[in-house]
Amino acid sequence: VALKTRESMWLCEAAGFDVVLVETVGVGQSEHQVGSMVDFFLMLLLPGGGDELQGIKKGILELADAIMINKADGESSSLARKTKLHYQSAMSLLASNDFWKSEVHMCSALEQDGIAECWSMMMRYREQGTQRGALERRRAEQNLQWMSQLTDEMLRQQLSDNAEIQQALPMIKEKVSTGTLTPVSAAIDIINMLGSRS
């Protein structure tokens, strides 16, 4: 996830786009970041016997509002059905939110099968979430997270840009690593230097 993904999404919405797609590559930290930015989190997976379920962190599954098993066509159809069953079973163990129970479906991008149903499901989610005020609450929570993230980034940048801090930092690090200064005292000293500049 790029540093300015939220800003890019906000600009797209301001320009009148009512649907903004955010794609990630793989399972990891980026999914958690995107999960705190979007209204609907769709996990797209390939057919597999369910063995890969062990490799997917529970936290990622908890983020998913829906799972689509792609390539559910040709020789992969049977495997896609098995994969769907594995994920339905796993998802049934997770708590649902206040208005939506995560769904698992199959599709074939190659044959354009299941794509319309996927879109219909997302629109159903949007309608239910809007009616219950859940999407508005989710956006408000996301904005608070964004504020915290921006505050952290801006403070880090100020620390990095402060010549006094950068000059003192090697000595402070040396004192912390030798035990002559506690990490807490060091952090307080650095923050005080930042405050003395204003």
Q: What positions do the PLM features span?
A:
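Residue-level signature of catalytic and energy-coupling elements of molecular machines
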Residues: 5, 23, 60, 70, ...
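Nucleotide-state-sensitive switch-loop elements of NTP-binding domains
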Residues: 1-30, 37-44, 51-52
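Flexible beta-alpha connector loops of hexameric P-loop NTPases
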Residues: 1-3, 48-49, 72-78
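Short acidic active-site motifs
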Residues: 29-30, 56, 114
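Long, well-ordered amphipathic alpha-helical subdomains in the mid-to-C-terminal portions
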Residues: 106, 117-194
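Conserved catalytic network of the ASCE P-loop NTPase/AAA+ motor domain
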Residues: 10-16, 33-37, 58-62, 96-99
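Canonical P-loop GTPase G-domain recognition
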Residues: 66, 72-132
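Residues on a specific face of well-ordered alpha-helices
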Residues: 3, 36, 55-58, 62, ...
